[in-house]
Structure formats: structure tokens, C-alpha cells
Amino acid sequence: METAVYAKSTRNEKVLNCLCQKPDALFKLICFPWAGGGSTHFAKWGRKINGLLEVHAVRLAGRETRFEEPFSNDIYQIAEEVVTALLPIIRDKAFAFFGHSFGSYIAFITALHLKEKYKMEPLHIFVSSASAPHSEFRPQVPDINKLSEEQIRDHLLIFGGTPKHLIEDQDFLKQCIPLLKADVDIVKKFIFDKPSKALLSRDITCFIGSEDVVKDIEGWKDITSGKFDVLKLPGDHFYLMEPNNEDFIKNYIVKCLELSSLDYF
């Protein structure tokens, strides 16, 4: 029988948000947020996902309980911090990464850091709505610092993912803009050359919305010597906000990890 522990305090709560601890879970799923996002959305997955998975959502500096900390300005710095937080909880169980958009790049660099420094790899990496890190077709990120508040509001409406009533809330927008600026600056500085050989060995699955403007997701296959799959679901860049899509993703992740564990062990 599944054992679950619901708690306000979490293990290593500074960086990792785990709302539902499952001591009997076979796998740990580590989720990485989109630009301007927090940990809550993915942390809630742990309450409804299959009992085989314990979900930990990454909480970046400058938001939620870390709001007093300065924003990170380097993706490699973020990866190092995440790895330090992860090590105590991933040594005893298989784990996987899921990242959406900006979070896909953090997940990738974190996986690289784990392999290079600790000879560890996620059982499976799930990326979402993100061009390959070395792709020449990565979307041009607008310079948020040069946009007016109204232009940022329009950009959020077009891009999706943020409810309209929140975008029109002045207090919310004032909180959101600094987060977006910090994360967008990281994305703009993140440059990655096409690898001459595979950097990872585990399978990568890429989810994307059918109406998303993101291109060259196929380039992720250059990253790994493992299998690579693309799954297209109805919707735009934030297709995963649709309940049916979210349920599909969670169920698919569980099935993939069950199959991957058979090959791995």
C-alpha cells in the first residue's frame, strides 16, 4: 500500500519543493520551472501522480520562500545548486527530470553536471516546449528591460500560460516582471554549441504543443546516445495547462520509467 506524507516542510525545502513525500515510491521525478515560474505548479503533481513517483519541484532563488535571495544570473550556477540539493535524495532511488521551456535547459545542464562530476544520470529526461540547446532556431527572446509594462502584459497574453485576470492585476505584474527579467537574461546568455558526440546516454522524450512556435525539437537527439521521441499534444506553448494533457504527461512518465527501469536494472 502506498505510504504518503503530506507536509508543509519539505526535505531540503530551500531548493526542492516536495508536497507529498512517498517513502515507498520507486522513482523520484525532479521538475524544473518555466521562465518566471515557481515550484508550486509541479510540486502539486506529487499529490495526484501515481504512487510510484515522488515529485520534487525546483524552487529558484528570488521567488516563493526564497524571495529575499538575489536572482541567479547563470544557468550553470543554478545547476550546481540543484545538484547539491539533489544528491542526498537521489543516491538511493532512480530519478528522472522534467523541464518545461526554460526549465528544459536547466534540466539538461543539471544532468550534464551530475554526469561529469558524479557519474550519475537521470533514468529518463523529459523536455517540453524547448528547442534543442544548440539549435540556431531557438526563439529570439525579447529584451524585457526595454519593454514597457504594457508590452510585457501583451507578451504574456500572446505567449500563454498566465491567466488573463492575473496579467491584468497590477500587483501580480509587479511581482512577475522581475522574475521574468531575471530568467530571460539567463536564457539570452545561454549559448551551447552542437556536441560532436552524445553527452548523455539515457532516453530523452520531448513534449510539445501542436500550435507552439518552438522549432527544432528534433535537435535534442544530438544530446544523447539513448532513444529520442517526440510527443505532440493539442495546444500552444503552455499546452500542459490543459488537464487532459497534464494527465497524459504524468501517466506517460510513469510508464516510461517503469520500462526504463527494466532495461537499467
Curated annotation (Swiss-Prot):
Q: Where in the cell is it found?
A: Cytoplasm, Cytosol
Which keywords label this protein? Acetylation, Cytoplasm, Fatty acid biosynthesis, Fatty acid metabolism, Hydrolase, Lipid biosynthesis, Lipid metabolism
Q: In the record, which positions carry N-acetylmethionine?
A: M1
- Please name the InterPro entries in this protein's record: AB_hydrolase_fold, TEII, Thioesterase
Quote the EC number: 3.1.2.14
One GO CC term of this entry? cytosol
Top EC category? hydrolase
* Signal sequence annotation: none
Chief localization class? cytoplasm
Q: What are the recorded Gene Ontology BP terms? A: medium-chain fatty acid biosynthetic process
Q: Which GO terms describe its molecular function?
A: fatty acyl-[ACP] hydrolase activity
Q: Name the chemical reaction catalysed here.
A: (9Z)-octadecenoyl-[ACP] + H2O = (9Z)-octadecenoate + holo-[ACP] + H(+); decanoyl-CoA + H2O = decanoate + CoA + H(+); dodecanoyl-CoA + H2O = dodecanoate + CoA + H(+); tetradecanoyl-CoA + H2O = tetradecanoate + CoA + H(+)
**One Pfam family of this chain:** Thioesterase
Q: Where are the catalytic residues?
A: S101, H237
| Role according to the record | Contributes to the release of free fatty acids from fatty acid synthase (FASN). Has broad substrate specificity, giving rise to a range of free fatty acids with chain lengths between 10 and 16 carbon atoms (C10 - C16).
Task: Name the family.
Answer: Belongs to the thioesterase family.
Q: How does it assemble?
A: Interacts (via C-terminus) with FASN.
Listed name of the protein: S-acyl fatty acid synthase thioesterase, medium chain
